Amino acid sequence: MLMSTRKKIWFWCLGVLLVSAVSIFFMFSRISRQRQYFLAVIPHFMIDPVKVQDFYSFLKGRFFPSHEMPDQIVLLSPNHFFLKQKRVEGLCTSGRIRFKDQTIVATPFVDDRIACNGGVFYEKGGQIYTKDHGLGEHFRWINQFFPTVKTVYLLALPTHHMEHASWLAENIQKLPWKTLVIASVDFSHYLSEVIAEQHDQVSFSVLQQSGAFDQLRGLDVDCPACLGVVYRLASKEKIRVHQRWRDSSSTIVGKDLMDQNTSRQFLWRE
């Protein structure tokens, strides 16, 4: 009788341990799959595409080591060609989007505040196109470094309409699992290298500060609103900004191009 009671106690203890182990396993599984977002600012000015490629490689290794991939990518660009558009513009339907000789499969980012018929994307002969280089110049790098990502959102923002940053950041924050957010942004335009470098130092300094959202609109960049989305996301998690490189068309060719100069910063947050 005593042995039978001991066996019952032993089996009960074993059952408790097994249940606890399973609970702990699922708890850690949920933790490892909780919502995460990874933030980067990458130029679309391709005077030196090798450096852009190197930065994508750097981000892949830093954010997604081994064979990991993000579950989705959100690519934010200034709306270069439809400057009167006050709404964020995205896709109407899923499909393969073409820019020059590059294509990418993309998905609509569903929100009533997003327009999809403003001209950033257009259909011709059954093919959806974009001519906006802020989006299209990144297609080849996304395909190269994140080839198995099935969900890519393409959004063109009215450059200085900062009111979109908060709600976009909130929506992105709700996306499941791992999200890579790329703000496609070029920095100083049409200035001598000395002035451009000064402006870029100011921009980086502002991005480093907390509570500086209202200052973003005045920065010498082509999409303050894109930076605003990343800034809002970073502020929620207190994620710091880091600079990988800063260059310009002047530093690349080795002479001051003056009013033909465009500068770039390669930034990430963690």
Regions found by a protein language model. Give the residues of each.
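Flexible, D/E/H-enriched segments
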Residues: 10-71, 80-177, 191-270
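Short, Lys/Arg-rich N-terminal segment immediately upstream of the first membrane anchor
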Residues: 1-8
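Divalent metal-coordination and catalytic microenvironments
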Residues: 76, 142, 186
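Short acidic/histidine-rich active-site segments
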Residues: 180-191
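Conserved beta-strand elements of the Class I
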Residues: 71-74, 180-182
